[in-house]
Regions:
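N-terminal beta-loop-helix "entrance" segment that forms/cooperates
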Residues: 54-74
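A conserved acidic, glycine/proline-rich C-terminal tail/linker
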Residues: 204-255
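Anionic-ligand-binding alpha/beta catalytic cores of soluble enzymes and soluble regulatory domains
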Residues: 138-207, 211-214
């Protein structure tokens, strides 16, 4: 027989539990191989109660800028202090540092290769360390799989409450790359740059709604094709026609 009282108690306890470990993963590993599963296994071996959320494992191989953008657009929607692991790491095994950092809303574990650039541009860095304390790594560290042997165990320990400062030596600066910015020409024309192309082929630009005055007189030009005005949805134009609109991230997009 179903026990309603027991069910209510379970929900209440779950809601009150503020110590649940929440960890996200973003990688370029794909899902055909064992890499993502191995990372999850390491995390669960340290914290069997951890909740692991996949943001994406379809980042183009070694595309640090794409990973930086994808994490930037996803992490604000997670609870504060979620630990976000980003492993797009063409320099694995080299002298590049492995780092963990705290920003205003979240914590991150990643290679120090610029993958945090968009996040830090939004909210800055409160604290950062180089992951030099091997106590929080796996006993044997592969030269080519720091995702499994350094980033995953560090994330699990961090989510369980190990202080950031205990993970390694403090850092005051980390690697970032210059972010594209829209350019406003003397005649009022705004020149934007493509930040990301999503899986539907939509172009996401660095231009935001506040960078120009909305109105029917807006003309956009892309690859020699002109778009008159802004739409609201994909169905505002016939099939095969381009439409420009403000997307869910607040950026100007072209579909």
């Amino acid at each position: 027989m179903f026990d309603c009282q027991q069910a209510r108690i379970g929900v209440q306890l779950g809601w009150r539990n503020s110590t649940v470990s929440l960890i996200t993963l973003t990688t370029d590993f794909g899902l055909a191989d064992s890499y993502v599963g191995a990372m999850k296994g390491v995390i669960l071996g340290i914290d069997p109660t951890a909740t692991i959320v996949d943001i994406s494992h379809d980042i183009a191989p070694q595309d640090v800028q794409e990973a930086a953008y994808v994490v930037y657009t996803a992490y604000p929607y997670f609870p504060p202090d979620t630990v976000h692991v980003v492993v797009v790491d063409p320099g694995v095994g080299s002298r590049r540092r492995a780092i963990a950092l705290r920003a205003a809303q979240a914590r991150f574990v990643a290679p120090d290769n610029g993958v945090m650039s968009y996040v830090l541009a939004r909210e800055g860095m409160k604290e950062a360390v180089s992951l030099t304390n091997s106590r929080y790594h796996r006993p044997t560290v592969s030269h080519t799989f720091h995702g499994r042997d350094i980033f995953a165990p560090v994330a699990a320990h961090l989510a369980r409450g190990v202080p950031l400062a205990e993970l390694g030596e403090p850092l005051t600066e980390i690697v970032t790359f210059p972010l594209p910015q829209p350019q406003v020409l003397p005649d009022g024309v705004v020149v934007g740059h493509v930040l990301h192309v999503d899986r539907f082929g939509n172009l996401i630009l660095d231009v935001r709604e506040g960078d120009f005055v909305l109105g029917g007189g807006i003309i956009l030009e892309v690859a020699g094709r002109r778009i008159q005005g802004l739409g609201r949805t994909f169905t505002d134009v016939p099939a095969g026609e381009l439409v420009a609109y403000i997307g869910s991230s607040g950026h100007l997009e072209i579909a």
